[in-house]
Amino acid sequence: SDITNKPFIEYLCEFSKPIILSTGASDLNEIDRAVSWIDNKGVSTALLHCILSYPTPDEHANLRMIQGLKKRYPDRVIGYSDHTLPGDMSALETAWLLGAQILEKHFTFDKSLPGNDHYHAMDKVDLMNFRCTIRRLETLLGEEEKRALDSETPARQHARRSLVAARTISAGMKITAEMLTWKRPGHGISPAEIDQVLGGIAVDDIHEDELLTWDMFAESRE
């Protein structure tokens, strides 16, 4: 509510401490202007996306604005000030997933207390559940590196396909695509290597549905 209060903002800057600026009920021009006032004083700023409506209905939460602020102010810390009803804490969880680095929400020991703050605040149970969820999300997110995990080894061995004979192949025959198919498990020649098999010569008779191995073929001399 004080984002347009230039004297107050400049007074806060005199403490030379980072300022956390909530953007509730403001537009981008007002945010830009307040940021410029703070920048002119040489003080760092964190911006919190916020909807100043108690409680904030889900359709007004507009959490994508967190990403919008990150794009508009790439050098700032961006967070979220939440006024939705706690429920399962989905708003804060989503804000965290969208990159919010600061999360702020009212806290109370009793949601039934009178006043305009307690009924939409989180309590200790909400906070504990939120913490557990974030810890699990951190585990689920993992890292940006794609590699085959040890836990996937059985799947790689048994769910992948191997080349097999689609029909009986007599010794001396040149291998063509029509002679081949692929089936589980993946213990034999991978279909990824089919080009190395095509054109080879069968050393011995190969029975229909037989798993192919490299020693079954010789290079064509053509």
Please provide the spans of the model-predicted regions.
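Catalytic cores and adjacent flexible loops of soluble metabolic enzymes
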Residues: S1-E222
